[in-house]
């Protein structure tokens, strides 16, 4: 329940700041919202809650003013802890602002000069992509042993995140070539 409230709260806050999100991140946050709504329906059949109830519960639990995100580092850390339970940091990944800019040069990928920098970026992206593919494979194996529906939903969500991130990285690699 606590992680569902947190996910509902974070998704709502991210969607309120839509102008700061790129399209891919916005789609990931929408998927997280859909996944969280599904969790709300399945987590307790005796006391069903709505999306708004989950957000209100999280706000009350944290005593957070809805107009500020002063406690954002704590929210981020708690969400990462939920992800660490699966030994994967892919739950937080969609909420990081994924932009198509190089941290080194702050240039658009198409304007990065040919040479060593572009080669290093491509090499790192391919390494990240291969690790995400391995994570996706491990998550697909983990699904077989799951007996808890909440864990199953979380693993399926994380597999979707992995697949979408892999597609974004491959698209970025193609734009660099």
Swiss-Prot record:
Q: Which organism is it from?
A: Influenza C virus (strain C/Johannesburg/1/1966)
Q: Where in the cell?
A: Virion; Host nucleus
Motif location (Nuclear export signal)?
Answer: 91-100, 117-127
Oligomeric state and interaction partners are given as: Binds M1 protein. May interact with human nucleoporins and exportin XPO1/CRM1.
Q: Does the keyword Transport apply?
A: yes
Which keywords label this protein? Answer: Host nucleus, Host-virus interaction, Transport, Virion
Q: Which Pfam families match?
A: Flu_C_NS2
One GO cellular-component annotation of the UniProt record comes to:
virion component
Could you tell me what this protein does?
Mediates the nuclear export of encapsidated genomic RNAs (ribonucleoproteins, RNPs). Acts as an adapter between viral RNPs complexes and the nuclear export machinery of the cell. Possesses no intrinsic RNA-binding activity, but includes a C-terminal M1-binding domain. This domain is believed to allow recognition of RNPs to which the M1 protein is bound.
**What's the protein called, per UniProt?**
Nuclear export protein
């Amino acid at each position: 329940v606590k992680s569902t409230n947190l996910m509902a709260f974070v998704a709502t806050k991210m969607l309120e700041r839509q102008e700061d999100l790129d399209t891919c991140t916005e789609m990931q946050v929408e998927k997280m919202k859909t996944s969280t709504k599904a969790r709300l329906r399945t987590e307790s059949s005796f006391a069903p809650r709505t999306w708004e109830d989950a957000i209100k519960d999280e706000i009350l639990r944290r005593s957070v003013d809805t107009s500020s995100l002063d406690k954002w580092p704590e929210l981020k850390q708690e969400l990462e802890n939920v992800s660490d339970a699966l030994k994967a940091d892919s739950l937080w990944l969609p909420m990081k602002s994924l932009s198509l800019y190089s941290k080194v040069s702050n240039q658009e990928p198409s304007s990065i000069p040919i040479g060593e920098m572009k080669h290093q970026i491509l090499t790192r992206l391919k390494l990240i992509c291969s690790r995400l593919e391995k994570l996706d494979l491990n998550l697909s194996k983990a699904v077989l042993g799951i007996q808890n529906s909440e864990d199953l939903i979380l693993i399926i969500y994380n597999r979707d995140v992995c697949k979408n991130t892999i597609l974004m990285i491959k698209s970025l690699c193609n734009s660099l070539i």
